[in-house]
UniProtKB/Swiss-Prot annotation:
Protein family according to the UniProt entry: Belongs to the CbiD family.
PANTHER family linked to this entry: COBALT-PRECORRIN-5B C(1)-METHYLTRANSFERASE
Record keyword Amino-acid biosynthesis present: no
Reaction equation(s) it catalyzes: Co-precorrin-5B + S-adenosyl-L-methionine = Co-precorrin-6A + S-adenosyl-L-homocysteine
Name of the featured protein: Cobalt-precorrin-5B C(1)-methyltransferase
Primary enzyme class: transferase
One GO term (biological process): anaerobic cobalamin biosynthetic process
Claim: Membrane is one of the keywords in the record: no
Source organism of the structure: Archaeoglobus fulgidus (strain ATCC 49558 / DSM 4304 / JCM 9628 / NBRC 100126 / VC-16)
Keywords: Cobalamin biosynthesis, Methyltransferase, S-adenosyl-L-methionine, Transferase
EC number: 2.1.1.195
HAMAP family listed in its UniProt record: CbiD
Listed pathway(s): Cofactor biosynthesis; adenosylcobalamin biosynthesis; cob(II)yrinate a,c-diamide from sirohydrochlorin (anaerobic route): step 6/10
Single GO molecular function: cobalt-precorrin-5B C1-methyltransferase activity
Length: 298
């Protein structure tokens, strides 16, 4: 049985057609499809982590690859250019069709002061660098591990030279983030969102009688914990496609993406009843406010 290491669904046995399938899937960087593979990318959090590790490792020798841990629990190998305490890492987004940060360069340089510092090109919101909690923990974990391995007692400064320019193509300014990109990542991997991915996930989901259609990783984790009888799948905004599944379904997600599906926040309950599906809306990360809409069966 071949299990995806990120979303923990099983792949159809008939799709496993070559010897490399298991190795590729277990790397986290490949999603097996009916006729081949889709490539996952790495998040800005993983890219920043790789830059920090490479900068430290390069104090010993020139470095071209490093292995970093991810929030999903899968170690990933990343190509780098690093020498004498300075590293450059190019983010790649796999087969994602519209990731504007694809190809952006992260730089990391060692410094005497212990700790992790974020420089130019990393956005700021309310006086704080725009680094998500999960990404910050990932970078810190890899920094500590590399520091111990190479007996390093200093710090690392991470910057994104083109961050401010690339950020203009994102929605950062609308949410109050200025001066650069955000450093994010709840799994460490970028899902290769495209039509083929949605079709592939739906085919995989057909193996299960009950599925939880989730809007993202946090909703996936919530569904996995609260509804263990349902196999969770991340479908993002592609909820209508997922509803084609003929078995029992629930939708679990945060209001931001659910209102896109419904047309507005006020219509979430109405859409649930129209589709005859239960919708669980998570209002915040602390699970202190959840509202549950029971759709009427057709």
């Amino acid at each position: 049985m071949l299990i995806d290491p990120i979303e923990l669904y099983r792949y159809p046995e008939k799709w496993i057609k070559d010897r490399d399938a298991e190795k590729k899937v277990r790397s986290g960087l490949y999603i097996l499809t009916e006729d081949g593979y889709l490539r996952r990318g790495i998040t800005t959090g993983t890219t920043a982590s790789a830059a920090a590790v490479a900068a430290i490792a390069s104090l010993k020798e020139k470095v071209e690859k490093v292995k970093v841990s991810t929030p999903a629990g899968v170690d990933v190998e990343v190509e780098v250019e690093a020498e004498k305490g300075f590293a450059r890492v190019r983010k790649f987004s796999g087969d994602h069709e519209f990731d504007v940060t694809n190809g952006i360069i992260f730089e990391a340089e060692v410094c005497e002061t212990s700790g992790i510092f974020f420089g130019r090109g990393v956005g700021v919101k309310a006086g704080e660098k725009a680094v998500s909690r999960s990404a910050k923990l990932q970078i810190l974990e890899n920094f500590i591990k590399a520091s111990r391995e190479f007996n390093f007692s200093g710090g690392v400064r991470i910057s994104v030279p083109d961050g401010e320019e690339v950020a203009k193509k994102t929605g950062n300014e609308k949410v109050g983030i200025k001066g650069g990109i955000s450093i994010l990542g709840t799994t460490g991997f970028v899902e290769p969102w495209c039509k083929k991915l949605v079709e592939t996930k739906l085919k995989i989901a057909m193996q299960y009688h009950r599925i939880a259609i989730t809007t993202g990783r946090k909703a996936w984790l919530y569904a996995r914990k609260k509804f263990p009888e349902y196999q969770p799948f991340v479908f993002g905004v592609h909820i209508d496609e997922a509803l084609k599944h003929p078995g029992e379904k629930i939708i679990v997600g945060f209001p931001g993406l659910l209102k896109i599906w419904a047309g507005s926040r006020d219509r979430i309950e109405e859409r649930a009843r129209e589709e005859g599906v239960r919708v669980v809306v998570i209002e915040d990360d602390m699970d202190s406010w959840v509202w549950d809409v029971q759709g009427t069966d057709h």
